[in-house]
């Protein structure tokens, strides 16, 4: 995947980037997303929720350069043209998990079939990352279906300057006739601000309200 190097000296975020990189400042935001329309459409079509969630999040991540900005393996700052999802799958026997990735296509059904194939192949492997090599342009997301939450944070030793976003969802919450998904976004402040966090959450909600635009 193409990596576009950033000329830091002439970058509009230079001062912000250097300040928050030196401070190693990350932040997380958690919102309840109304997935009522999305969930009902998914069930009507006979799909599983998790791959639809992965596809939706990846689409939003790839819509903004800020979410795709990081360091490549050569230590160069830049942004990828596209990110791929590295997501967790749970092993019901060992009660552990693995992280695998599946390339996202423009067509949801094509991605859905690839997802099912990868899960069948790698679930129960006993390895943390059974599908290798993991591409450089991969971001992390997961879902914790056993509990809901109003806040979530990952404490990372960030000596390697990991700048890509991390997305975590929780157990559905039923409120009347509506279904809500707790959703947490964790970002590095050197590349993402509150503005970008708001864009992310609002875009997730908008696409959840219009699943026919991308699900079918």
UniProtKB/Swiss-Prot annotation:
Enzyme Commission code: 2.3.1.28
Active site: 189
Catalysed reaction, written as an equation: chloramphenicol + acetyl-CoA = chloramphenicol 3-acetate + CoA
UniProt-listed SUPFAM superfamilies: CoA-dependent acyltransferases
Gene Ontology MF terms: chloramphenicol O-acetyltransferase activity
Class of the enzyme per the UniProt entry, highest EC level: transferase
Gene3D superfamilies in alphabetical order: Chloramphenicol acetyltransferase-like domain
Regulation: induction: By subinhibitory concentrations of chloramphenicol.
GO biological process: response to antibiotic
Recorded family membership: Belongs to the chloramphenicol acetyltransferase family.
Name of this protein: Chloramphenicol acetyltransferase
A Pfam family it matches: CAT
Gene that this polypeptide is encoded by: cat
Span of the signal peptide: none
SMART domains: CAT
InterPro entries hit by this protein: CAT-like_dom_sf, Chloramphenicol_AcTrfase_AS, Cmp_AcTrfase
Keywords: Acyltransferase, Antibiotic resistance, Plasmid, Transferase
Known partners and oligomeric status: Homotrimer.
Function: This enzyme is an effector of chloramphenicol resistance in bacteria.
Organism: Staphylococcus aureus
């Amino acid at each position: 995947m193409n990596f576009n190097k950033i000329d830091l000296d002439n970058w509009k975020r230079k001062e912000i980037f250097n300040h928050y990189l030196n401070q190693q400042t990350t932040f997380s935001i958690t919102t309840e997303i109304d997935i009522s329309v999305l969930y009902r459409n998914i069930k009507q079509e006979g799909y599983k929720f998790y791959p639809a969630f992965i596809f939706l999040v990846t689409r939003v991540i790839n819509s903004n350069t800020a979410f795709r900005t990081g360091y490549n393996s050569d230590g160069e700052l830049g942004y990828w043209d596209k990110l791929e999802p590295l997501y967790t799958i749970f092993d019901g026997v060992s009660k552990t998990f693995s992280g695998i990735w599946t390339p996202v296509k423009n067509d949801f059904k094509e991605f859905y079939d690839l997802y099912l194939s990868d899960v069948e192949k790698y679930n129960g492997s006993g390895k943390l990352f059974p599908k290798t090599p993991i591409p450089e342009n991969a971001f992390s997301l997961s879902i914790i279906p056993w509990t809901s939450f109003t806040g979530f944070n990952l404490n990372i030793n960030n000596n390697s300057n990991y700048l890509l976003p991390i997305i975590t969802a929780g157990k559905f919450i039923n409120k009347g006739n509506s279904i809500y998904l707790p959703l947490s976004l964790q970002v590095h402040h050197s590349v993402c601000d509150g503005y970008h966090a708001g864009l992310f959450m609002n875009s997730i909600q908008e696409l959840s309200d219009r699943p026919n635009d991308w699900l079918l």
